[in-house]
Amino acid sequence: MNTTVSGLLLCLATFIGVHLSANPADAEELVRFESAPVKLSPFRIRKALEQGEILSQPQGTPLLGYLSRPAGDGPFPAVVILHGCDHLRLSVKELWPKRLVRWGYVVLVVDSFTTRKLADTCRSALPERVFDAYGALDFLSKSGFVDIRRVALMGFAAGDTAALDATKTDGNEQLMERKFRAAVAYYPACDADRGDPTVPTLIMTGERDNWSRAERCQKRLARLSDNAPPVELNVYKGIYHNFDAPEFMVGRRVLGHIEKYDADAAAKSMRSVYAFLRKYLAN
């Protein structure tokens, strides 16, 4: 290859590299924020006053997050993502954010474990994650490029269980200044007694998922009131846990549960998410 051609290719590579790295749509930014503080209820405050106590407002927990955004000034709709009990796997931290950014959404993936020095919570629960979600929402409200009226909460497994808890009637949502517009739940642990959601909700799970059983989600839907926001439940026949995650192309058994990717179910679920967000995060 002659010197002129080599020089041109080098310049072209440099140009492409610079412009791709400068494009916000291709950049992932590490950000820091705090979970929403556990707000004291009016009842708790009143009881403390009756007993002569002075209560201090609890502080939020420092958290890390990964922020991705489309090119342009916005304001854009946004999606807050809560990872599962196994922390930040590839599909949650990279594949879904890139997909959502292509669709026109700002994405904030919340890391609930690193600052708490946790490896996983697959044998336990972390109820504080509801407050992590609202801390992320507060963070986005200060960005200037997010339309805070159009933010959805999306979670996977344990993260989705937290998402459903964060958007339920009589839950902590009523104490929060800012609200989510919609919720997307991949294979959550549904609770038939959780009550009505406060926002339109999309739930997707596999028929053979014995970790997040579809029957429990079906029971919850059967108990919703007539005035509940719309809830869509998609149960994919013959499908296991983590069906949307290509890192589980070869199935594996974890704590007695099968995790296995399925390309067809994954594609169907992505189309459902796309249509759901387009509908409920529209202007």
PLM features: residue spans?
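Short alpha-helix in the alpha/beta-hydrolase fold that links the catalytic acid
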Residues: 199, 213-223
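Alpha/beta-hydrolase active-site loop
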Residues: 123-144, 165
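Alpha/beta-hydrolase fold nucleophile elbow
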Residues: 146-157
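Short glycine-enriched nucleophile-adjacent loop
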Residues: 160-174
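Short substrate-entry loop that stabilizes the transition state in hydrolases
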Residues: 74-76, 81-119, 210-214
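Short beta-strand/loop motif that positions the catalytic acidic residue
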Residues: 203-205
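N-terminal cap/lid segment of alpha/beta-hydrolase-fold proteins
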Residues: 25-73
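C-terminal catalytic histidine-bearing segment of alpha/beta-hydrolase fold enzymes
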Residues: 230-283
